[in-house]
């Protein structure tokens, strides 16, 4: 007999929602049992700052970026911002990196 396989499912949101709606969507995704929430790197807000804020609105859901093009950010500042989200979220950051 085959054992069932648990497949984690995430949700990708646009960041163009007003803040109260975006925070509510993040809480709803967490309550619905989604494994992760992703925001695009290019949008209306700074992705890592927004994820840091969403960390305060959630407690379990993992928080991820879309692909961050490495040439678009200073490496040291990206490392600091990522570390800040990682600390603020209790280790829930998924940082997607790419060449552009």
Locations of regions flagged by a protein language model:
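N-terminal beta1-alpha1-beta2 module of alpha/beta enzyme domains
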Residues: 1-65
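Structured beta->alpha junctions
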Residues: 43, 67-70, 74
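Flexible, glycine-rich active-site loops centered on histidine and acidic residues
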Residues: 2, 6-15, 72-100
């Amino acid at each position: 007999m085959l054992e069932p396989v648990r497949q984690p499912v995430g949700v990708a949101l646009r960041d163009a929602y007003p803040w109260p709606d975006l925070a509510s969507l993040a809480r709803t995704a967490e309550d619905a049992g989604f494994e992760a929430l992703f925001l695009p790197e290019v949008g209306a807000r700074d992705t890592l700052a927004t994820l840091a804020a969403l960390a305060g609105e959630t407690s379990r859901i993992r928080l991820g970026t879309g692909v961050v093009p490495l040439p678009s950010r200073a490496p040291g500042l990206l490392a600091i911002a990522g570390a800040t989200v990682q600390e603020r979220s209790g280790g829930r950051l998924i940082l997607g990196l790419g060449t552009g």
